[in-house]
């Protein structure tokens, strides 16, 4: 054994097999293999405890504080707080410490509570009882004590305690059914298969007698991928090696169904299970708003440093004159006079930093997080986005990208299952040029369709009849369909009846396969079932044919085909293969290729999904060679997928073409309307699909991506066969630039309205040539730039024959182009996950191809039509709200701090604060925080119906329109202007002591309180003026926050607080309000402060209105006209009356406008004076108007 171990080490590290460290070896039942067997290096594995919590009782405080102070804003305010503690600063440490303490405490309580819930869930899971096999008997232990190598028994409706290799079940065929709803959301039953050599072990003693080792890959989070092999030792013979795949793996979290019990061996436990590995979140995506917010913070940080530096310099300039540095009432001590000048200057600089630090809003981060978290529920609560048929509603997997939904410039969408229903219906099949459709049967004979007779001029004959039946057998055998037989039931141990063809219900992860099997059933051949590795079909003579299933060459999106190897009762071995025409035709050496290709292209143009079917007969020697090739690839632990692909390539060649099938996939409801609305919103839509060009092109026309006026440009393999890639790209570039002229960012993002209507079609092979390096070793960047130049001048792009990674390449190419547009990817299948993860926003459609797309997406919706409301309504609102929140926070903090800066010029730069400590502390926490939070949750600047009806409003917020530098500078200067009004208005009004009742001048605290009062009123009323959508909650919060400020000030200044060391605010607020000039000053200053913003909005709405502002004006006029008496409406002019009569003439003298269904309703011409709402009346209900 030692020599064997040494040999293993030498081979592993000296013979180039170092990659083997990526695998693990497991002794089943902890039994070592017999003497002489291969030795393995023992490894240490974790126990089966699941720990999803982040903290423990001991490390919660230090770890949570460390995580929170990793955020730059929190760390910044911590530094400010420490500076206030260390040096003599003008403000109390409470002013910075209390807000920081509040933010840290709220976050810690929230995270602590969430972690406590995780602890409870972990304990319940770890203490769950599990049945082990130990010395041939069942032993019950807690789940956390399970170890790798233990043999476990799981009963029906129990959850698997760890990741298990399926050894056996009570079923004779060695299968079991599981549901994985807790893992991927799929509630359908999935079939898993036991190891071939262990499926007969039905008792504890049988399983305990097993001697085997399992070699498998190290843990990785992909739920649908697993590579391993099992070595079963029988006596002293060489071990039997069997491959292990995902069909043999039972995942922790899945539930056993319709199976009494199973036995399995633990291979991944605890935090190494796939379920635990999927706890880790996806890579963090950052929205454009968040990036802008961080940029603005840096700007304000620079302003803060500049203010502190200017005041420090001016302080020493001012103190340079005699007696200013040391007045008679504040003489310095000897030690103070001898202090280093630079040290004093640095200390003063820090003190000014503390004084002005409130320009950085500490509460903005908390408010933004609350707004995103609470706002995300508006999507999940939206009843319009709930699908009754599926019983599913939208899902929000992250709330960090809500506002990004309002910034999308490119949409990349899958076709099958996203634009289409993925509900396949068999239409026809073509066998050697003859076309067959269901139900065309006469006297038991299948007749060719009349539309296909002209393709050949003779009947099939005897040879054709054989090929015809061989074609139907190929369809019945080449698939992975399961049969749910109502007569057979689930009890396989009892007597079985022969299944009735009419009672068969087919189940498959691929709707295409179900449609094909059901289609040939209507043509006379019925697939019955797979039993004991034999496939049974019922032919048109009602005889049951049995074929032994020898091998399955599974489908993958790269090969685009699948095959089966079967053996008939007469001993003949066949390989049946079906797949895409581009995948089958190059491997065909015999058959009527031209006739079949012609029919395939015709069906593709009609939008049908096509597959080609071929076969070849294998000699026993050929089958043995194929078996050895497949077995070698299947048991490989390294590069198994690559080796299998090479083996498939060797086997699937020299085929005989049988024919082709056509399946219809209907377009989803309102898919065309959704794409049309998105294009009107200025969003470019690209379709990325694996289908052939003709099929995808027909779908694009059906969904209005391409129109009759669209000039299609092709960049396909067929085109490249005629010209070089360089020539094709330059020709296309000249074509699109001939009418487009110079390119702008608007043309790139699809927002240009004068773009020529070009459509581009590119296939996967052409994209590979564009993306790969040049033959001369130079970069292919120039090809990419040419390609992007063509794409940015096309209104729509179709990418066909795309592999999953190519979809992600396309998204990445556009995402990182020089314009950096915001991208969105939407799909429903596992092949769409790569592009969903690559795009700025990923949306999964909850479809029929599983939940992988929905699980890996940022948002999930039931149907493609729901994308319209998600972007045009929710995305629009989210962006408007969050951008206003960010700008408003900076604005109100400029208003807050700039008077403090101005005050230093009147107090000798002594760092005297203008506001009381309580006001400094509560300004951002209590007085001004709730109104903007409610605004950012509930604001609707235009109605929901208007946004859905007019998609062009989406253009007004495109390209981060509300957070550009121009808008940011406007808000900043507005804050500076208001601060100047507050400070100097109060200063000049109360500079003359005659305006007060008793002739005394206001003190600095009364002056500061007056400025603060005007400021709170102005910033709150500014928000009220910006509010378009009022509810009782808005009224309560806005006016309630003002009343709270007044009540607090009365209480704070009306009581002598014994715990305070000072009483400087006593009677200040009451004294201020008792002065008539103070009331006059408040009213005047608030009015002047709001005036510029009001004037700007009035002038812009009248002179340079945006589309949104025009819509708001129309809505305002409509609301007024609802109360206008009918007699006051403008009369119809003669010209308008004649026009109306001409348009509305009909034989009955009436015009009837019916309810809108699927086509555009003609809009009746109305007099300009009529209310705007009347324009849409005919679309809502039947309307009759006399001529």
From Swiss-Prot:
InterPro entries in the cross-refs: ATPase_P-typ_cyto_dom_N, ATPase_P-typ_P_site, ATPase_P-typ_TM_dom_sf, ATPase_P-typ_transduc_dom_A_sf, HAD-like_sf, HAD_sf, P-type_ATPase_IV, P-type_ATPase_N
Record keywords, A-Z: ATP-binding, Cell membrane, Endoplasmic reticulum, Endosome, Lipid transport, Magnesium, Membrane, Metal-binding, Nucleotide-binding, Phosphoprotein, Translocase, Transmembrane, Transmembrane helix, Transport
Keyword Repeat: no
Protein name: Phospholipid-transporting ATPase IH
Loss of function: phenotype: Conditional knockout in afferent spiral ganglion neurons leads to age-progressive hearing dysfunction characterized by abnormal auditory brainstem responses and normal otoacoustic emissions. Outer and middle ear function is normal.
Any one of the GO BP annotations: positive regulation of myotube differentiation
Site location (Cleavage): 457-458, 493-494
Record PTM Phosphoserine, positions in chain: 740, 1148, 1158
Pfam families named among the record's database cross-references: Cation_ATPase, E1-E2_ATPase, PhoLip_ATPase_C, PhoLip_ATPase_N
Chain sites annotated for binding ATP: 414-416, 513, 555, 578, 609, 689-691, 801, 807, 831-832
Cofactor(s) annotated in UniProt: Mg(2+)
Modifications after synthesis and translation: Proteolytically cleaved by CASP3.
Tissue and organ expression note: Widely expressed. Expressed in myoblasts. Expressed in retina, brain, liver, testes and kidney (at protein level). Expressed in the inner ear.
Membrane-topology descriptor: Multi-pass membrane protein
UniProt topological domain (Cytoplasmic) ranges: 1-61, 111-296, 373-884, 938-967, 1027-1032, 1097-1138
MF annotations from Gene Ontology: ATP binding; ATP hydrolysis activity; magnesium ion binding; phosphatidylethanolamine flippase activity; phosphatidylserine floppase activity
An example Gene Ontology CC term for this record: recycling endosome
SUPFAM superfamilies with a match to the protein in the record: Calcium ATPase, transduction domain A (SSF81653), Calcium ATPase, transmembrane domain M (SSF81665), HAD-like (SSF56784), Metal cation-transporting ATPase, ATP-binding domain N (SSF81660)
Main subcellular localisation: membrane
Active site location: 414 (4-aspartylphosphate intermediate)
Membrane-crossing segments per the record: 62-82, 89-110, 297-318, 350-372, 885-905, 918-937, 968-989, 1004-1026, 1033-1053, 1072-1096
Tagged with keyword DNA-binding: no
Assembly information from the UniProt record: Component of a P4-ATPase flippase complex which consists of a catalytic alpha subunit ATP11A and an accessory beta subunit TMEM30A.
Annotated function: Catalytic component of a P4-ATPase flippase complex which catalyzes the hydrolysis of ATP coupled to the transport of aminophospholipids, phosphatidylserines (PS) and phosphatidylethanolamines (PE), from the outer to the inner leaflet of the plasma membrane. Does not show flippase activity toward phosphatidylcholine (PC). Contributes to the maintenance of membrane lipid asymmetry with a specific role in morphogenesis of muscle cells.
């Amino acid at each position: 054994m030692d020599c064997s171990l040494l040999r293993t080490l030498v081979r592993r590290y000296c013979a180039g097999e170092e990659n083997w460290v990526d695998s693990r070896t497991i002794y089943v039942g902890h039994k070592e293999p017999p003497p002489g067997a291969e030795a393995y290096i023992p490894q240490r594995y974790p126990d089966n405890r699941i720990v999803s919590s982040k903290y423990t009782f001991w490390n919660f405080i230090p770890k949570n504080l460390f995580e929170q102070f990793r955020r730059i804003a929190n760390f910044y305010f911590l530094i400010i707080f420490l500076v206030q503690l260390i040096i003599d600063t003008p403000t109390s440490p409470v002013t910075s410490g209390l807000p920081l303490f509040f933010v840290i405490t709220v976050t810690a309580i929230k995270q602590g509570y969430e972690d406590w819930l995780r602890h409870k869930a972990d304990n319940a899971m770890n203490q769950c009882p599990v049945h082990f096999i130990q010395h041939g008997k069942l032993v019950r232990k807690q789940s956390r004590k399970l170890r790798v190598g233990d043999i476990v028994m799981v009963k029906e409706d129990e959850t698997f305690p760890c990741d298990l290799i399926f050894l056996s079940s009570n079923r004779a065929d060695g299968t079991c059914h599981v549901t994985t709803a807790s893992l991927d959301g799929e509630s359908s039953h999935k079939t898993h298969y036991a190891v071939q050599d262990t499926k007969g072990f039905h008792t504890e003693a049988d399983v305990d007698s097993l001697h085997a080792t399992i070699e498998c890959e190290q843990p990785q989070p992909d739920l649908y991928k697993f590579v391993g092999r099992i070595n079963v030792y029988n006596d002293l013979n060489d071990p039997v090696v069997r491959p292990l795949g995902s069909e043999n793996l039972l995942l922790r979290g899945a539930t056993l169904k319709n199976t009494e019990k199973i036995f399995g061996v633990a291979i991944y436990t605890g935090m190494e299970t796939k379920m635990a590995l999927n706890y880790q979140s996806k890579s963090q995506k950052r929205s454009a708003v968040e990036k802008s917010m961080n940029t603005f913070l840096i700007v304000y940080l620079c302003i803060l440093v500049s203010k502190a530096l200017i005041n420090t310099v001016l302080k020493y300039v001012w103190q340079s004159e005699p007696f200013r540095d040391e007045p008679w009432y504040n003489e310095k001590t000897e030690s103070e006079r001898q202090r280093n000048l630079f040290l004093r200057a640095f200390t003063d600089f820090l003190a000014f930093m503390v004084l002005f630090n409130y320009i950085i809003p500490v509460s903005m981060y908390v408010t933004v997080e609350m707004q995103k978290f609470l706002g995300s529920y508006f999507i999940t609560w939206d009843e319009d986005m709930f699908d009754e048929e599926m019983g599913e509603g939208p899902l929000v997997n992250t709330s960090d990208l809500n506002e990004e939904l309002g910034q999308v410039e490119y949409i990349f969408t899958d076709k099958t299952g996203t634009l289409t229903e993925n509900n396949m219906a068999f239409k026809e099949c073509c066998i050697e040029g003859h076309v067959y459709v269901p139900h065309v049967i006469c006297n038991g004979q299948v007749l060719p369709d009349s539309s296909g007779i002209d393709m050949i001029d003779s009947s099939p004959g005897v040879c054709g009849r054989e090929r015809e039946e061989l074609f139907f057998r190929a369809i019945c055998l080449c698939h992975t369909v399961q049969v749910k037989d109502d007569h057979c039931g689930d009890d396989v141990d009892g007597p079985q009846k022969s299944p009735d063809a009419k009672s068969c219900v087919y189940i498959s992860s691929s709707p295409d396969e179900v449609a094909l099997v059901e289609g040939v059933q209507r043509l006379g051949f019925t697939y019955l079932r797979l039993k004991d590795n034999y496939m049974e079909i019922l032919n048109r003579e009602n005889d049951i044919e049995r074929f032994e299933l020898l091998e399955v060459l599974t489908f993958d999106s790269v090969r685009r085909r699948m095959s089966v190897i079967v053996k008939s009762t007469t001993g003949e071995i066949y390989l049946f293969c079906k797949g895409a025409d581009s995948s089958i035709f190059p491997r065909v050496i015999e058959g009527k290729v031209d006739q079949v290709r012609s029919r395939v292209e015709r069906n593709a143009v009609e939008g049908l999904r096509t597959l080609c079917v071929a076969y070849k007969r294998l000699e026993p020697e050929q089958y043995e060679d194929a078996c050895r090739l497949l077995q070698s690839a299947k048991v490989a632990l390294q590069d198994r997928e690559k080796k299998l692909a090479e083996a498939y390539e060797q086997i699937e060649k020299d085929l005989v073409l049988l024919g082709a099938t056509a399946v219809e996939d209907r377009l989803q409801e309102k898919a065309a309307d959704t794409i049309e609305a998105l294009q009107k919103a200025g969003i470019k839509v690209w379709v990325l699909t694996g289908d052939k060009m003709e099929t995808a092109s027909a779908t694009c026309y059906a969904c209005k991506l391409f129109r009759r006026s669209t000039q299609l440009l092709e960049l396909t393999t067929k085109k490249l066969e005629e010209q070089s890639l360089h020539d094709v790209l330059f020709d296309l570039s000249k074509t699109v630039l001939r009418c487009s002229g110079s390119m702008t960012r608007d043309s790139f993002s699809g927002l240009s309205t004068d773009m020529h209507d070009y459509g581009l079609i590119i296939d996967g092979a052409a994209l590979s040539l564009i993306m790969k390096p040049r033959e001369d070793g130079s970069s292919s960047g120039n090809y990419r730039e040419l390609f992007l130049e063509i794409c940015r001048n096309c209104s729509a792009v179709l990418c066909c024959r795309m592999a999953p990674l190519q979809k992600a390449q396309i998204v990445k190419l556009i995402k990182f182009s020089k314009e950096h547009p915001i991208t969105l990817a939407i799909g429903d299948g596992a092949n769409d996950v790569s592009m969903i993860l690559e795009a700025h926003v990923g949306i999964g459609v909850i479809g029929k191809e599983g939940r992988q797309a929905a699980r890996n997406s940022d948002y999930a919706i039931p149907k493609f039509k729901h994308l319209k409301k998600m972007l045009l309504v929710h995305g629009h609102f989210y962006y408007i709200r969050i951008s206003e929140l960010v700008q408003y926070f900076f604005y109100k903090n400029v208003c807050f701090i700039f008077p403090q800066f101005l005050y230093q010029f009147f107090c000798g730069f002594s760092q005297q604060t203008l506001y009381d400590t309580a006001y400094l502390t509560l300004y951002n926490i209590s007085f001004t925080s709730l109104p903007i939070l409610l605004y950012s949750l509930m604001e609707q600047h235009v109605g929901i119906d208007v946004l859905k009806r007019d998609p062009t409003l989406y253009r007004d917020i495109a390209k981060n329109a509300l957070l550009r530098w121009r808008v940011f500078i406007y808000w900043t200067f507005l804050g500076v202007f208001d601060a100047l009004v507050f400070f100097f208005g109060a200063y000049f009004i109360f500079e003359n002591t005659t305006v007060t009742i008793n002739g005394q001048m206001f003190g600095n605290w009364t002056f500061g309180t007056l400025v603060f009062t005007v400021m709170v009123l102005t910033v709150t009323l500014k928000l009220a003026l910006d509010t378009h959508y009022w509810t009782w909650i808005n009224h309560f919060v806005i006016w309630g926050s003002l009343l709270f400020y007044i009540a607090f000030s009365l209480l704070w200044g009306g009581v002598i607080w014994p715990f305070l060391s000072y009483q400087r605010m006593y009677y200040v607020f009451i004294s201020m309000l008792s002065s008539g000039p103070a009331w006059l000053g408040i009213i005047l200053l608030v009015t002047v402060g709001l005036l510029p913003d009001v004037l700007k909005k009035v002038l812009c709405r009248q002179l340079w209105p945006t589309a949104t502002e025009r819509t708001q004006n129309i809505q305002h006029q409509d609301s007024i006209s609802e109360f206008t008496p009918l007699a006051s409406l403008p009369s119809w002019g003669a010209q308008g009356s004649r026009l109306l009569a001409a348009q509305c003439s009909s034989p009955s003298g009436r015009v009837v406008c019916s309810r809108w269904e699927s086509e555009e309703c003609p809009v009746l011409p109305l007099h300009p004076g009529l209310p705007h709402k009347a324009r849409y009346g005919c679309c809502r209900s039947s309307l009759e108007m006399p001529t």
